[in-house]
Amino acid sequence: MNAAELVDRAEISDVVIAYATGLDRRDWSLYRSIFVDELEMDFVSVGIPAGPYSADSWVRDARRLFAGFEATQHTSTNHVHTIRSDTATCVSNMQAEHF
């Protein structure tokens, strides 16, 4: 692995970390910054229908949902990166606590 690949991996992990940090700090600008304008989300396991969403509506709905919690903690571990040319995937374990 060369230096450029290590930088790519770090930048990809930074996006995953910003996801958790944005939610936990209620930093909605940070949270919005990690998304492209149109997303494909799947949170069926918690009752949110899978499908396409606009990033703005996703963030707006998250903001509404998280207003009901006093605190949250999202922890992301075991980042596994697959990088091919200009396409990358990061699979990680996310543990979320909502209080």
Language-model segments: which ranges?
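Short, low-complexity N-terminal intrinsically disordered segments enriched in polar/charged residues
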Residues: M1-D37
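A solvent-exposed, acidic/Ser-Thr-rich amphipathic alpha-helical stretch
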Residues: W28-A96
